């Protein structure tokens, strides 16, 4: 599988010297804010038998699809790093069985601890939300966590109310030097 990961320039140095790069939990941005979501995703990787090195707590992230296209990110877009930061876009090839794909937009249901319902329009969504709020907290929580499985459906859908697969992210445990196909440098906007 061909993927692209956006990393600080130091990661290129780590790959050159150590031959492998992994996530350092202490340096992971947003870990404290999204601890539960990240650990849920790690658990999902484990449930899918993605080989998990025992010394690693968090995976690395990469892009698979942007704007419904499987191609490297457009460096002119915002959100690929802190504005003004010099970054490296590392293109690499990794075996499919070492990767878990998910819909980037849907991932926000997990990050924000929200129920991911099946509404097809706003009226239906309001009705579903009203019903959901009447449930016991333990039932709501189970429904919410169960609903998150939908983030792993990356089938492209372009709808007025429902869209899916426009932005697909990938998580994996290790980036090895021999996986790297190319590195492009850019300044984040």
Model-assigned labels for residue ranges:
Residues 39-70:
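Short, well-structured hydrophobic secondary-structure segments
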Residues 20-50:
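Membrane-interacting alpha-helical segments
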Residues 1-2, 9-13, 17-30, 56-58, ...:
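Conserved NAD+-utilizing ADP-ribose enzyme module
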Residues 5-10, 36-39:
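Short, functional N-terminal and low-complexity linear motifs
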Residues 3-5, 62-63:
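Short hydrophobic-aromatic micro-motifs
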């Amino acid at each position: 599988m061909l993927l692209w990961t956006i990393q600080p320039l130091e990661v290129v140095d780590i790959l050159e010297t150590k031959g492998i790069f992994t996530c350092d939990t202490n340096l992971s941005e947003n870990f404290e804010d999204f601890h539960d979501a990240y650990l849920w995703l790690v658990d999902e990787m484990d449930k899918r038998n993605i080989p998990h090195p025992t010394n690693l707590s968090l995976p690395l992230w990469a892009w698979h699809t942007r704007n419904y296209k499987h191609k490297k990110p457009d460096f002119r877009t915002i959100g690929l790093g802190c504005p003004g930061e010099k970054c490296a876009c590392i293109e690499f090839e990794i075996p499919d069985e070492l990767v878990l794909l998910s819909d980037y937009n849907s991932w926000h249901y997990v990050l924000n601890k929200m129920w991911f319902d099946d509404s097809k329009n706003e009226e239906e969504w309001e009705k579903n939300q009203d019903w959901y709020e009447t449930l016991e907290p333990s039932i709501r929580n189970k429904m919410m966590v169960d609903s998150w499985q939908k983030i792993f459906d990356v089938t492209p859908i372009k709808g007025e109310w429902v869209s899916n697969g426009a932005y697909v992210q990938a998580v994996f445990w290790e980036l090895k030097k021999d996986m790297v196909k190319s590195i492009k440098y850019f300044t984040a906007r």
